[in-house]
Amino acid sequence: MSNKRKMLVTCALPYANGAIHLGHMLEHIQADIWVRFQRMRGHQVYFVCADDAHGTPIMLNAAKQGITPEQLIAKAKADHIADFQSFNISFDNYHSTHSEENRNITTAMYKTLRDKGLIKTRVISQLFDPEKQMFLPDRFVKGTCPKCQAEDQYGDNCEVCASTYSPMDLINPHSVVSGATPIVKQSEHFFFDLPNFEAMLKTWTHSGSLQPQIANKMQEWFESGLQQWDISRDAPYFGFPIPDTENKFFYVWLDAPIGYMASFKNLCDRTGLNYEEFWQKESKTELYHFIGKDIVYFHSLFWPAMLEGCDQRKPTNIFAHGYVTVDGVKMSKSRGTFIQASTYLKHIDPECLRYYYAAKLNERIEDLDLNLDDFVQRVNSDIVNKLVNLASRNASFITKRFAGNLADKLEDEALFAEFVAQASNIADHYEAREYNKAIRLIMDLCDKANKYVDDKAPWVIAKQADREAELHAVCSMGIELFRILISYLKPVLPQLATRAEAFLQTELRWDNIASPLLNQNVAPFKSLFSRLEKKQIDRVIEETKALFSTQPKTEQPQVASTMNDNQQQNIEPIAAEISIDDFAKLDLRVAKVIQCEAVPESNKLLKFQLDLGDHQRQVLSGIKAAYSKPEELNGRFVIMVANLAPRKMKFGLSEGMILSAGTGGADLFLLSGDCGIRPGMQVK
């Protein structure tokens, strides 16, 4: 195809100290859908990842198990690869940060930075475990928060009041490793001169390489002042030694992102690809990182600064996503919702999760809720009842009455053209990572396809001998519409698409969507997808509970997060109690956004044109800071107070109030509803 693009796509590196869970899978599914879509469009895409295999937790866990760190990370890598393959994640290479490629690139980049005067040294004071004879990283110290006096808090931040501090400030600290009271020791550490890159980073922040929410967060960091970054750790430590030093190692977060380069270098060495073409400073290729919101700090500040300092190219874009919650709350081991990928795979088709995540994913940094009841309902409703049923209800007639041969012309050319015409819109949604919009549009088409079959009623036509040609045309048309739909869904449901290709006897490509299957044989129809049963979910939950109930309860230091939504927030107190009669006075309605635009003269207001089913309303809402691209709200459902008296404002009439949650300003989130809601529905 013309304008063929060359891309390198990465996912954040899973830590080699634990199993893959459904939180990890959100990112890898999101990236894989995007990669598969780009490949369908004819672009050249390389998709790589690796295990993040260094750090104190791995060293200690290996010692606890009586094995070497190398043995521990080898097993983790094999397990991770097996899980990703089972979920149909189409990596071209999956490597490890504990590799010769990573050692060589990390060492070379460090020496470049050092020789440019970008590595500084100074003596710092640290907590030291006198029993284990080791310096203690922040998360290996616990004590009482110096700000709010909450007990049992980690050495870098308080999960009660959200304060950050030095582990030296903890009250009554103790070592998570041994329980001993740490002492203070001094050590020379090595620092990357991040402030030297502030001007470059400010320019890069506004270059379009970051989501607006990340750019806003970076502005806060700039205002707070950039600090030199400690890139060293003291022995004992599992990682790469720093050249020309004794008992000093690179901090895991220095060599972890370099793992992207190392994994690609490994692929290049095996396949003959040109490594420099993708990483040289003036590269014409594209580089994309899919990451979680908790590691934005490292990827948006340290990583581009390191690349700039080493005369390497910077990412084309960084795509961050939120966390996974289950039934509205944080994943829980005790409730059985901290589900490992391997547990899920024993009981449920991986494509069920791929579809559900896709149906909810958008380009914003929002947490995604895996509602287990909705999961079952949506998979069965969309994939089984709508999509697969469309094929099966027509295929039986084609096989039995027409020897598997499709008609030689389209029964409804206008309907075919309507389906094909949506290819560009669906492609735009995939490109923008607005998978929820793509799925919504595809399912709208699926409803139209099933309505076509319902209206034509081939089961009635089949009973009339003189309508054989009509039966052939109608059922062939139904199969043709199914072909278009499954083509659109191929990036999301690759295994279902493969089974559909075997049935249709053709390859599903983006460039042949507009080419109908005329006078072509299809294979005898076989079941394409099985219904998802609630009992399968129940088995996953129970097995997860059992898995963690048998594991010893030991303290596991957590990876620090710079954008941690799981910390307890400053929640506003509950308002004064009201009666049910008071609540009944509110008429809350579902509304669909017809058009949303900024009010140019206002710093706060967006103007909404809303569909309430039987009429339209205009509402002015002060959420401009939270939604910098108001046009992206078009088509969304919102909840509004419909019986609020109209209010004449400076910028126009506001006929109601749209509901949102948050503390105000940029921290506001529109409320919406579940699948199936329609404009005008009353909220009860």
Curated annotation (Swiss-Prot):
Q: What stretch of residues is annotated with the motif 'HIGH' region? A: 14-24
As annotated in the record, motif 'KMSKS' region runs over 330-334
Entry binding sites for ATP: 333
GO (cellular component) term, any one: cytosol
Q: Which Gene3D superfamilies match?
A: HUPs, Isoleucyl-tRNA Synthetase, Domain 1, Methionyl-tRNA synthetase, Zn-domain, Nucleic acid-binding proteins
> GO molecular function: any one?
ATP binding
Record field: catalytic activity: tRNA(Met) + L-methionine + ATP = L-methionyl-tRNA(Met) + AMP + diphosphate
Q: Which GO terms describe its biological process?
A: methionyl-tRNA aminoacylation
Share what the entry says about its subunit structure, partners included: Homodimer.
NCBIfam families to which the protein is assigned, alphabetical: metG, metG_C_term, PRK00133.1
The record's family statement is:
Belongs to the class-I aminoacyl-tRNA synthetase family. MetG type 1 subfamily.
What does the function comment of this entry state?
Is required not only for elongation of protein synthesis but also for the initiation of all mRNA translation through initiator tRNA(fMet) aminoacylation.
| Entry protein name | Methionine--tRNA ligase
Q: Which organism is it from?
A: Haemophilus ducreyi (strain 35000HP / ATCC 700724)
Name of the encoding gene: metG
